[in-house]
Design a protein with these regions (language model features):
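A short acidic/basic microdomain associated with nuclease active sites
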Residues: 212-243
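Active-site beta-strand-loop-beta-strand hairpin of nuclease catalytic cores
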Residues: 242-253
Length: 253
């Protein structure tokens, strides 16, 4: 009884309750995952390691530039600046009443701090924002609640004026650095190929973090993937292992 009460309470917090749900434990775990909020600095680091430094992604970076007319480095720099600006804005403005335009950011604000062409900045802002007219038109044509969620997730800036933008949701804004960026790559013509390449790049990224952890640890040793068994039926081990005196952690990304 108490478990069901907790489930319904958490569901109400999320503004959604599935009456058909029978497994309250899996629903609880789902809510925890959906509520997870990564640090945006970690997202930026992850984006740089995968989308910029991993050369297997280079060919998709060219497609990204062709489709969006923006280099991925420019996109990451602009988005990070926007997040940083809004994050520090409350300390500068204070908690009292203020004009909504004080919370806004413009392409000129970004240009004053970053060495990026103003046309590129405007293109990025248009990619991640929506105007009032666009908002109304989309809601009229897409009554599905799920589609509304995805629309705001990918466009978390609201254009309150011709060149003034404010964030709709802080978490969605931070997700522009990695989660939304990945979906932008998936919209390229070679989605299936990108998904496979991204999976390998993400695996290398995760294993590099684990390897680095073990390198600086005095109690742990890292061992990577290896092949075993006779030819021609050789098999591959899991992706990695963390070895210590207490046991072994097997990693499969």
């Amino acid at each position: 009884m108490m478990n069901m009460f907790i489930h319904k309470m958490l569901a109400r917090i999320c503004d959604y309750h599935d009456e058909r749900c029978e497994n309250i434990y899996s629903e609880f775990i789902k809510i925890l995952f959906n509520s997870e909020r990564d640090k945006y600095i970690a997202k930026m680091y992850r984006a740089i390691k995968i989308f910029i430094e991993d050369h297997d992604i280079d060919k998709y970076n060219n497609l990204f530039l062709y489709k969006y007319n923006v280099d991925v480095k420019e996109y990451i720099n602009v988005v990070y600046f926007i997040i940083k600006e809004f994050t520090s804005m409350q300390d500068r403005i204070g908690s009292g009443e203020c004009n909504i335009y004080e919370w806004g950011i413009s392409s000129q604000d970004i240009l004053n701090k970053l060495n990026i062409d103003i046309d590129k900045i405007d293109s990025i802002l248009r990619m991640i924002s929506l105007s009032y007219d666009e908002w109304i038109l989309f809601l009229a044509n897409n009554p599905s609640q799920k589609e509304r969620f995805y629309f705001f997730r990918d466009k978390p800036l609201f254009a309150i004026d011709k060149n003034i933008y404010i964030p709709i949701d802080g978490r969605f804004l931070e997700e522009l650095l990695f989660d939304t960026l990945r979906r932008m790559y998936e919209k390229l013509e070679t989605k299936s190929n990108f998904s496979r390449t991204f999976g390998k790049s993400f695996e290398r990224y995760i294993l590099s973090l684990i390897n680095e952890f073990c390198f600086y640890s005095k109690q742990h040793t890292y061992m990577g993937e290896f092949e075993y068994g006779p030819e021609p039926l050789r098999k591959k081990s899991p992706d990695g292992f963390i070895i210590s005196e207490d046991g072994i952690v097997v990693i499969e990304v």
